[in-house]
Amino acid sequence: MSALFISDLHLCEQRPVTLRAFFAFLQGPARSVQALYILGDLFEYWAGDDDATPLDNAVSDALAALAETGTSLFFLPGNRDFLLGESFARRARLRILPDPTLIDFDNEGVLLSHGDILCTDDEHYQSFRRLVRDPAWQLAFLERPLAQRKQVIEGLRFQSETAKQEKASDIMDVNAFAVETLLREHGYPTLIHGHTHRPAHHVHVVDGRSCERWVLADWHDDAPYLRWDGAGPPVALRFGAKLGT
């Protein structure tokens, strides 16, 4: 099996270079593998599937075109786009996964997550996450007028950016105990996640067993991704955005 893993693109009109990189990526590296896994924060924010902007439509069309070539598409929601639903998924021809999701990758267990569930030192954020991930809360929120939803989201984004300036850097990273607990609960797999914007390859020894953890990079003026072919180990690569190479 061959697959690419990406996260934290934060697509929006204000980031045209990232948009160009993403569309080029879908026409390039993504067509050379069997599966593409998008592990959250594909969009800068998502107010609901009824907010069909030209950008959103262009992204869904590009993903659907990739699916037409035979690449299977999977999306695991992030903290910015957890309201993305089945309507968009149908248009984009992708499957939405729960967080976390354990997959069988050539007879090896691989655990996928956006990664924010591991940042347990940030107790304020975890309380907020539990609230907004509750299905009842989401249903009530999506029943509000679109303009009101977008206003609320803009306010939350401002609060989030302000709070980041006041938080210690370490509480916004993953908690080692949370990582080890998750690995133990899922049979000591390889873990792939994003969210922290701290790309790295870690090895955790849990109950005497070595478990790899790959942290995906966020996108700026290039397009970082993790490629994994069944015959070898994962490889972190970058697809040049500005040059399209």
Swiss-Prot record:
Pfam families linked to this entry: Metallophos
UniProt GO cellular component terms: cytoplasm; extrinsic component of plasma membrane
InterPro entries found in the cross-reference section: Calcineurin-like_PHP_ApaH, LpxH-like, Metallo-depent_PP-like, UDP-diacylglucosamine_Hdrlase
UniProt pathway: Glycolipid biosynthesis; lipid IV(A) biosynthesis; lipid IV(A) from (3R)-3-hydroxytetradecanoyl-[acyl-carrier-protein] and UDP-N-acetyl-alpha-D-glucosamine: step 4/6
Lineage: superkingdom: Bacteria
Positions with a binding annotation for Mn(2+) 2: 41, 79, 114, 195
Membrane topology: Peripheral membrane protein
Keywords, alphabetical: Cell inner membrane, Cell membrane, Hydrolase, Lipid A biosynthesis, Lipid biosynthesis, Lipid metabolism, Manganese, Membrane, Metal-binding
Entry cofactors: Mn(2+)
Residues holding Mn(2+) 1: 8, 10, 41, 197
Catalyzed reaction equations: UDP-2-N,3-O-bis[(3R)-3-hydroxytetradecanoyl]-alpha-D-glucosamine + H2O = 2-N,3-O-bis[(3R)-3-hydroxytetradecanoyl]-alpha-D-glucosaminyl 1-phosphate + UMP + 2 H(+)
Gene Ontology biological-process annotations: lipid A biosynthetic process
Cellular localisation: Cell inner membrane
GO molecular function: manganese ion binding; UDP-2,3-diacylglucosamine hydrolase activity
Signal peptide start-end: none
Cofactor mode of binding and number, as noted: Binds 2 Mn(2+) ions per subunit in a binuclear metal center.
Residue sites binding substrate per the record: 79-80, 122, 160, 164, 167, 195
EC numbers for this chain: 3.6.1.54
Family, similarity comment: Belongs to the LpxH family.
Function: Hydrolyzes the pyrophosphate bond of UDP-2,3-diacylglucosamine to yield 2,3-diacylglucosamine 1-phosphate (lipid X) and UMP by catalyzing the attack of water at the alpha-P atom. Involved in the biosynthesis of lipid A, a phosphorylated glycolipid that anchors the lipopolysaccharide to the outer membrane of the cell.
Name recorded for this polypeptide: UDP-2,3-diacylglucosamine hydrolase
Lineage: Bacteria, Pseudomonadati, Pseudomonadota, Betaproteobacteria, Rhodocyclales
Gene that this polypeptide is encoded by: lpxH
